[in-house]
């Protein structure tokens, strides 16, 4: 616990104690696992800006994935209720961090319940685009993090739906050779659709706010770490797909070439910002190799660096994937519902170890 620096901090601590005490009292008088998960959510999402959710509480929440579907559903409902009923930026950020941990470390049954909540779906999935906490300068700064982080996680879930598995999930079993064979069986259209989604996710990652000046650095650092891990996972996926397009370079249609060029340009525009986010040496050689592959693919499909202008003139008539079109598709693909199942366990492999690069809990970048 950080020290109390304002009356608002004191009120937040009192609220934490009151809500946790009430939940603990009720939980002690019942055998319901639902109340146990609810208590862990409360303990993981305190009003304290100096600490992210504790590993012990995260482990209890993630354990909901080892039970029944009803158990997993109740755990997700507790998280979402906490997220949607709070007006505190710290509580909201910690709730979003829990969601991110479920995507990365949760078992499939828990991830599945997260992906279908709410059943109706919607573009503003986490409903935080208008979030404002005006209690203090710090809360005002952290509010921008809440709005961005919620949108980023919406993109992460959307991209996962397109890919057919959860990006950056550590529940991976398929080896590199088998995975590459699966990718080679995809059509150009499927590959381009997946590349478009992955690049869109990295573009959203680039919009991460600057570190708050007034405090909350530990929360921001934790989020940056998680996003950095997603960055590594995303370029793993892109690497395989760009290699596949190298093999198909002589058979690409003009339209496919245009879409690939657009994706490469969008990706390159992210490079500098992504390097700022991921500024350490972890996997630095691999990351540099990926950007080298991007340059190589550009050259293979026609000295594109020199011919971008000519190709771009054709885009207007061809129908570039612009933002309006992407937004129109977002709602349709965001939630992984039972009526529109994702290919988790069939030909698209639900558990894939891209290049056998396990993403650990340590700071990657």
UniProtKB/Swiss-Prot annotation:
Pfam families: ANTH
SUPFAM superfamilies documented for this protein: ENTH/VHS domain (SSF48464)
GO cellular component: clathrin-coated pit; clathrin-coated vesicle; Golgi apparatus
Keywords annotated in UniProt: Coated pit, Cytoplasmic vesicle, Endocytosis, Golgi apparatus, Membrane
Main localization category: membrane
GO annotation, biological process: clathrin coat assembly; clathrin-dependent endocytosis
Top-rank taxon: Eukaryota
UniProt domain ENTH: residue ranges: 29-167
Subcellular location: Membrane, Clathrin-coated pit; Golgi apparatus; Cytoplasmic vesicle, Clathrin-coated vesicle
Gene3D superfamilies assigned: 1.25.40.90
Recorded GO MF terms: phospholipid binding
Keyword Membrane tagged: yes
Protein name: Putative clathrin assembly protein At4g40080
